[in-house]
Curated annotation (Swiss-Prot):
Residues 1-100 are annotated as: N-domain. Mg(2+) 2 binds at residues 176, 178, 226. This is Flap endonuclease 1. The keyword Magnesium applies. Its EC number is 3.1.-.-. The lineage of its organism: Archaea, Methanobacteriati, Methanobacteriota, Stenosarchaea group, Halobacteria.
Length: 327
């Protein structure tokens, strides 16, 4: 999920949706979906949206509730899916698994104690994106004719690359600050929140701190990334000062007598990640509302009332824009 401390360095400002109308946004699908999945579960409980065979489908409710935000503001989302995870993330994944297991134990305790509020909070934290969640969400997006891209590796890296190199893509969409290290020129954050999004500007960040892209990545590595734990005593300010004094990661490490395992590889994962140009984006989407609704409510047994408003909003936005891409 990246290092949230990087916010202290990032050039970020709130941006009205009116300024974004007509834009194409390459969305980190994992990041976006997980936010809606956990929010749905926290407010309703995972058991509320479970099929007769025990399959959890809260993701479908979350997706239907979250998509109208794009459509109502004239944005075309392109959801970019992870194709694989680098081996350097193994430790991070193991840590998350252990943390989830701790939450599951605490969840059992909260349920036994009858603490509904604490149980709801912990239930949300135990969620993970299962293969079924991925498959059902993708099929829903297909029915709604929403563009999707399969990344060869990290979806966020692919989204950043598309924003940087493809004139058809205007913004990346992710709450993960790694988009900054990955060189996304402009990233929209808080797309799952109720207000206007935040715009994170890559060039403005570099200019504000007199950094090169490589040096920004070095600052991130010193603070810690999904691929390394960081160096003790280094936060954004101290890392920035150290890079300013010594020039790059290697000279800082030499001066501090420190070492970052796989440092070269980690640097390359941000500067030259595994990405592809083998994708097609068609912004002229034609959502099949009835088919999508039937998929969610009939095939996956979601209560029709839970998604009625979401589908109504998508349908209304498609009709109101008067643009070819929504008709």
């Amino acid at each position: 999920m990246g290092n949230a401390d990087l916010r202290q360095l990032a050039a970020i400002e709130e941006t009205p949706f009116a300024d974004l109308e007509g834009s194409v946004v390459a969305v980190d699908a994992h990041n976006w979906l997980y936010k809606y999945l956990t929010t749905t579960v926290q407010w309703t409980g995972a058991d509320v949206y479970t099929t007769s065979d025990g399959t959890e489908v809260a993701n479908l409710v979350g997706a239907v509730q979250g998509l109208p935000k794009f459509f109502e503001h004239g944005l075309t989302p392109v959801f970019v899916w992870d194709g694989g995870v680098t081996e350097l993330k193994d430790d991070e994944i193991a840590d998350r698994r252990e943390q989830r297991e701790r939450y599951e134990e605490q969840l059992d305790d909260a349920r036994e104690a009858g603490d509904a509020a604490e149980a709801a909070r912990l239930d949300a934290r135990t969620q993970r994106l299962t293969p079924t969640i991925h498959e059902t969400t993708r099929e829903l997006f297909d029915l709604l004719d929403i563009p999707q891209v399969e990344a060869p590796a990290e979806g966020e890296a692919q989204a950043a690359y598309m924003t940087r190199t493809d004139d058809a893509v205007d913004y990346a969409g992710s709450d993960d600050y790694d988009c900054l290290l990955l060189g996304s020129p402009v990233t929209l954050r808080q797309l799952t929140s109720s207000g206007h999004p935040e715009l994170m500007d890559f060039d403005a960040t570099l200019a504000e701190h007199d950094l090169t892209w490589e040096q920004l990545v070095d600052v991130g590595i010193l603070c810690g990334t999904d691929f390394n734990p960081g160096i003790d005593g280094f936060g954004p300010t101290t890392a920035l000062d150290a890079i300013g004094e010594h020039g790059d990661l290697w000279d800082v490490l030499a001066a501090e007598g420190e070492h970052v395992a796989h440092g070269d590889r980690i640097r390359e994962l941000f500067l030259n990640p595994d990405v592809t140009d083998d994708y097609v984006i068609d912004p002229d989407v034609s959502p099949a509302i009835d088919a999508a609704r039937a998929f969610v409510t009939d095939e996956w047994e979601v209560d029709a009332d839970a998604v009625a408003r979401g589908f109504e909003r998508i349908d209304a936005a498609a009709a109101q824009t008067g643009l070819d891409r929504w008709t």
